[in-house]
Amino acid sequence: MIALIQRVTRAQVDVDGKTAGKIGKGLLVLLGVEKEDNQARANKLAEKVLNYRVFGDENDKMNLNVRQAQGELLVVSQFTLVADTGRGLRPSFSNGATPALADELYRYFIRKCREKIQVETGEFAANMQVSLTNDGPVTFWLQS
């Protein structure tokens, strides 16, 4: 399971011209599910996202996690994160989970995060438009 996290001052995801999810300060989490993923990996990644220290403290050092910074999460499914780009000029998605497994683990990841923080979401498998203001910019690739 892969999470591309971006520290944002605002982020929004629209589906069919309507806002599906919107946050102020927090993390935009683009989430990709691989075929070998399971709930244990989703738990591990959720804990990592929630506890990863990417927000500045009083000395402007990255010592605070999203909860300590009183931020929110916007979680958006993005299967292209699991692409194999090592060969040729076209990505391969053979590492990706089936749509059923990906949807199940995407929803599970969101439920685990919602136990500890406010979470907004996109719509699984939809064509979405994501807008954000990346703060820093600060972007990290996390895997479980």
From Swiss-Prot:
Give the superkingdom in one word.
Bacteria
Q: What is this protein called?
A: D-aminoacyl-tRNA deacylase
Q: What does this protein do?
A: An aminoacyl-tRNA editing enzyme that deacylates mischarged D-aminoacyl-tRNAs. Also deacylates mischarged glycyl-tRNA(Ala), protecting cells against glycine mischarging by AlaRS. Acts via tRNA-based rather than protein-based catalysis; rejects L-amino acids rather than detecting D-amino acids in the active site. By recycling D-aminoacyl-tRNA to D-amino acids and free tRNA molecules, this enzyme counteracts the toxicity associated with the formation of D-aminoacyl-tRNA entities in vivo and helps enforce protein L-homochirality.
The stretch of residues making up the signal peptide is none
BP terms from Gene Ontology: D-amino acid catabolic process
Let me see what the UniProt entry remarks about domains: A Gly-cisPro motif from one monomer fits into the active site of the other monomer to allow specific chiral rejection of L-amino acids.
Against PANTHER family, the record matches this protein to:
D-AMINOACYL-TRNA DEACYLASE 1, D-TYROSYL-TRNA TYR DEACYLASE
What SUPFAM superfamilies does this protein map onto? DTD-like
Q: Name one Pfam family in it.
A: Tyr_Deacylase
Sorted alphabetically, the Gene Ontology cellular component annotations on this record are: cytoplasm
Fetch the CDD domains from UniProt.
Dtyr_deacylase (cd00563)
UniProt family annotation = Belongs to the DTD family.
Q: Which organism is it from?
A: Actinobacillus succinogenes (strain ATCC 55618 / DSM 22257 / CCUG 43843 / 130Z)
Q: Motif Gly-cisPro motif, important for rejection of L-amino acids residues?
A: 136-137
Instruction: List the HAMAP family.
Output: Deacylase_Dtd (MF_00518)
Return one GO MF term: Gly-tRNA(Ala) deacylase activity
Task: Using the UniProt record, give the first listed, main subcellular location.
Answer: cytoplasm
